[in-house]
A protein has these predicted regions:
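Short beta-strand segments enriched in small/hydrophobic residues
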Residues: 6-13
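Typically the conserved alpha-helix immediately C-terminal to a functionally engaged Cys/Sec
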Residues: 20-36
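Short, flexible/disordered intra-domain loops and linkers
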Residues: 16-22, 82-83
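Alpha-helix termini
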Residues: 32-42, 127
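Local cysteine-cluster metal-coordination motifs and their immediate loop/turn environment
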Residues: 15-18, 87-89, 153-164
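Thiol/selenol-based redox catalytic cores and closely related redox-interacting motifs
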Residues: 52-59, 64-66, 70-149
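Short, small-residue-biased leader/transition segments that mark boundaries at the very start
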Residues: 1-4
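Thiol-based oxidoreductase modules, predominantly thioredoxin-like and allied folds used
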Residues: 40-54
């Protein structure tokens, strides 16, 4: 029989944000490298990319910070660390903090492949526990600022979202 292994990549932008684009590229490379090993171990790999476009989507996905990588519903990071993301600030027209990744005593805006591979392997084969998405959720202030700023910027220009 085959066991399902689910990986999700949640992000704000893949056109402008260097963190999101870089993490996307590294994650896809890691999943490509690991896919044969998972197949050999009897795992079926399911991969989903989710662009979080609204505060409502962020709430539905219990999105804490961009970018986020989840394995079987659990964030690969034990905590959320952030710093100013100029790219997302440009999108929203206001200062926005996005995720940074700590690995082996260093901090990265784009996580190294080794960190992602190690986290995926550790989480894929650990016993099933309740997902990170249980319990209370409140939209983090950084995401509220991003979505509010993005909406305001859209409405000040030629509104393409149809909300104004």
């Amino acid at each position: 029989y085959t066991t399902l292994f689910r990986s999700e990549y949640l992000y704000l932008d893949l056109n402008t944000c260097e963190r999101c684009m870089g993490t996307d590229k590294v994650l896809e490379g890691v999943l490509d490298e690991l896919s044969n090993a998972f197949k050999m171990a009897g795992y079926s790999l399911e991969y989903h990319k989710v662009k979080i476009e609204t505060a409502e989507m962020a709430n539905a996905y219990r999105f804490l910070s961009s970018p986020t990588i989840r394995v079987n519903g659990r964030d690969i990071c034990n905590s959320v660390q952030e710093n100013n993301c100029g790219c997302c600030g440009d999108i929203a027209g206001t200062q926005v903090d996005c995720r940074v990744f700590s690995y082996n005593g260093e901090t990265y805006e784009v996580p190294p492949a080794e960190m992602i591979a190690e986290a995926i392997m550790r989480m894929a084969f650990r016993p099933k526990v309740s997902s990170c998405c249980s319990g209370g959720y409140v939209l983090p202030d950084n995401l509220k600022k991003f979505f509010d700023g993005k909406h305001q910027k859209c409405c000040e220009s030629t509104c393409s979202c149809g909300c104004c």
